[in-house]
Every structure is written in structure tokens, then in C-alpha cells.
Amino acid sequence: MSLPFLNTAPGYDEELRNSVFFERGLHATSICGAVGAAVAVAMLQGQDEAGIASAAGIAASMGAGLLEANRTGGTVKRVHCGWAAHCGVAAADLARHGLTGPPTVLEGRFGFLQAFCGDRAHPDAVVRGLGTDWELPRVVFKPYPCNHFTHAGVDAALRLRAQGLAPADVTAIELGVAKPVLRTIAEPPEAKARPASGYHAAFSGPYTVAAALLGGGLGVSHEDFTDAAARDPRRLALAALVRCVEDERCSASFPHAFPAVVRVTTRTGEELEARVEVNRGGPGNPLSDEEQARKFHDNAVRSLPEERAARTLALPDAQSVEDLTALLTSAGER
């Protein structure tokens, strides 16, 4: 396996990531992420091509993650991203100390792509555009701390709220999304209407639409996903009014976008609709600098003192390497 092939490990084709992995119940973030992290760490360590290949080969035996918790419960998915990072560092260190991995770990008969994707794996697509078509500009910054499939519904609900819709006036809500999205945010319906915890609320279309209509944070914030918030009678009453359905326009855009449409019926019989075609946070609908700064701040102060969070946010204005070093060496202090 060549080094250019390795460098594409974290950047599998979008359709492959969002379709094949999820249909099999696999969490691509924690599986592909382990391999990508191993490559990045090995490169930062200055390992040669063989060492980087071994790091990827080792990580491919470590990466794991199932999506059943999205449907029926459990909070294990919260550790998936951290586990991928852990695997990447461990794999690179093991390779640096002499452990080896199979050189055809990605494309081999019993390799990564065949094991996880079967006949739908297309290794050629992984290297298409290598060196000319960069994925980084297409990175999406999530504005809300909930499943990405819920975001367009959140924004549609926020749009209706901004137009003056009062939650107390709502008698029925229809949330239209792409058909493949329903299994994540709408099924089983009873569990999505009454999430078992704040964590499970983050994967509920009905709950996130209700939270958006009630307002808060950037629209929906961490405070909306506590266990107490998930038990809030106002939120649950509003979520119970939400019916999730397939919308053909949304299905036509999937998986290149995760659009949604929210249709509301009011007590007076008025019917309102808001459709969001392009998710916020990506190149087609980016967050403003102020929104990104606010997101960083709101997350950072959950672990760092306010002063240190502010200093970190001001990092682009650092006058010297010493300023950066001082900030990094004190990052673990509270």
C-alpha cells in the first residue's frame, strides 16, 4: 500500500461513508477515524512510509463502533471519537516500536474496505483527485450538539420561531427528511418522542424540533440535552406533536446534504412551512466568525476557567512562540 493511498484513509468517498457504513450499523467516525488518526500521528512522529503503513494496518484492527445505541439506548457512542483518537496514537506508537501491520490492510481480500463495505467498496474512489481535490474546505462545523441529521429540522423550526410562531399555538408538526435519515432520528417513534435521557434526545427529530421552537443558545445548546431537559413536560408535549415522514426532495439530496422541511398547523388552522436545503456550518452555508467563537467559548468554559478560554480564543493574536507554549503547557490546569 503506497503512502498516497494511506493519506486518503480518513477521506473516504462521501457516499461510502454515509450510505454503506450506516446501512450496516457501523459508525464511520470511530472506524475510519482510528486509521486516519494513526496516519496523522505516524507522520507527525516522522515515521517512514513503512512505519506509516504499519500504523494504519494496526489501527484497522482497533477501530470499532456500532450505531445500535442511537436506536435502543446506551451512551457508549459518546466515547467513539475519543476511542478513535486513542487507537490512532496507540497504533502509531506500536508501529514506531516495531509492530507491523499488513501492507494491503485497506484494499486486501480480508482488508478494511472488504470487511466493512463488502462488494460496495470502491478503492479507486479513495484516491480519485488525490493531491488536487482537497476535502478540508468541505469540512462542516456543527452548530448544535446533536446528531447532524437533526440540524436542518432545528434550523427550519428556528426560522418559524423567528417569524413569530408561538409554541402554545401549535397543534401539529410534520418533520420531513430523507428516507435514510428516519432510522436515526425517527425510529422507533415512541422512543424518539420521549427520549430516555439527554443523550438520546440528541438523536431525536421530534425532541430537537421542539427544543428549537422553545429557543436557547445558538438555537439549541448543551443545556437542551441534559437529563432534566429531556424530561421537561413542555418539550415532551411539543415533541409528541411531531410526525416524521420522508420528503422526496430531501431524499433526492441525500447523502450530499441533510435537508429538512417543517410544516406546522396552528390552533387557528393556519399552515406554516420552512424548508432548509443546505445545512449550516458547511461551505454552502457557513457559520459566522462570531458564531464559531461563541461555540468554542460555550464548550471551553465547561472544562477551563473563563480567562483561559478567552486566551485560547485569542490565540491567532499571539505575539510569540512563547505565548503559544505557555498556553499549551497550562491547558490541563483548571
For the regions a language model picked out, list residue spans one by one.
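Glycine-rich, mobile lid/loop segments that gate access to catalytic sites or pores
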Residues: 1-90, 102-109
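Terminal-appendage/accessory-domain detector
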Residues: 69, 76-86, 93-334
